[in-house]
Amino acid sequence: MHSLYLQALQPVYKAAHNEQEEIKIKDTQSFMYQLTINAPEEKGWTHEHILEVMRGNFKTLVYICMADEQGSCYHTHIFVVFASRVRFSMVKRYFEEAHIEKCKGSVSDNVNYVKKTGKWETDETKQEKKIEGTFEEYGAQPPDSKGKRSDMSELYQMVL
């Protein structure tokens, strides 16, 4: 009888265990995130409101830029940089409706994606979607060399 009870519980435990693992995997930490909000104005997500939510809830916010596009639906791309790592779940808490991704590439790569400049300028499909005059940024754009120590680079160059 005891083994039947354990067998009955096993699928529940596995499902709960897998959900916890999935949450752990998704709840990564990062200095930089890209967010996309579809139909932002219908949901009250103006650029001003986005900035207000970021400033009010993320004390380590260093830089944010955003721009609007018209694809299959109107949407806003947002790129944020924090001074310290922020959990995915924290960003999701305040931007539930947004598609959120941990950033790949440099700060400049991500800003260029939002602006549709750099390599994105030659992509006609992206240029057609860009809505001129909607790009906004707040804070100073961090350098691409995050994590590199200039004093160590100088020392290395002196040794060579």
Describe the function of each predicted region.
Residues 58-71:
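Short, glycine- and small/hydrophobic-rich beta-strand elements in well-ordered beta-sheets
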Residues 71-77:
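The conserved glycine-aromatic submotif of the RRM
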Residues 80:
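Extracellular, beta-strand-rich glycan-interacting domains
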Residues 1-58, 83-160:
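Catalytic "initiation/cleavage/transfer" segments centered on a nucleophilic residue
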Residues 32-34, 61-63, 77:
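Beta-strand-rich binding-surface signature
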